């Protein structure tokens, strides 16, 4: 049974009134058969890994890893594949863009990197990972380079340009390069995620930097941001909006979130906003790209072991696009891209409702028999003394189990979870 419930709980014995208005439930438009048929992109029989976005004209290029789960995440080596889109609704597959190396080569796996245009060519700086190298006394992760004239056909130049892990840093955690042009200093800046050598449990995760005038000769400049907060930094990103620079990382912890810092200078200091994350535990490894004034965050939502909500999160899953915007105070927020929101037909409207429950939880059904893919929009007002309110959907008719968004007013937060959990 697929239903939507409105629910409310009082705070102690105070009266609790929740008003729900302007409610609409809208089903997904049908798509052309030549494109993927899911709103959130995932190539058939693969799981979407780290994404290295680029943009040209009105097209976003999603260079990304495809995990085959043979027999498990990271089981079968992968390179980078490519899909393009102009609206994050319709995708066109371009196949393999950067193939993996052999089992004997450094880039047995093509780990994350970045794509950019400079010096009359397109460039990829990527992480070559060989899982067998540590037992041979070699660094498992080395930065490598490839070039292209058309974004589709790439030539590896690893015999000309490599970045080996520097002394004092972990040779097996040295990855995810990201390159920008520093206009102020007239040089290229490359940052990557790493950690200090030593026990993996120590909070020595950091972003380090290299600089170059010509993309060929690089100088190691040490730490870019080393806050001592995380065991590892992954997928670093740098971009500027107005007067502010922003540095994003994906952090290693039980939280596994994307966090950001902001500064008026690439030299810091890097300030932590009150809300420094873009999403929760189940959205990871995002990079951004700005095309025609629209900056998109390209991250993935992980699967869980055995597709069981009670299982552990796994690496890779499904791509979800967030649009990044800047608030008046310089902090960042994310929202659904307009093209995704507008990919739905005008749908069913519901009557406004009021839930008045002074002593106990109360529910009211908003919609019966929704499809498995829809958008929902409503204005919600609540009275002083309301403890929480929420929305439940996809209810199991026999057990009463469902998913829910629960807004806990007392704690000033909301959760997405199963109910009961």
Positions of predicted regions on the chain:
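Intrinsic-disorder-associated, low-complexity terminal segments enriched in Asp/Asn/His/Tyr and depleted
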Residues: 12-15, 25
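A carbohydrate-recognition surface predominantly in extracellular/luminal proteins
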Residues: 111, 363-387
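Beta-rich carbohydrate-recognition and catalytic domains
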Residues: 16, 21, 30-176, 181-233, ...
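Short hydrophobic alpha-helical segments enriched in small aliphatic residues
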Residues: 3-6, 23-26
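Secreted extracellular polysaccharide-interacting domains
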Residues: 238, 355-373, 400
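Short, well-structured beta-strand segments enriched in hydrophobic/aromatic residues
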Residues: 295-297
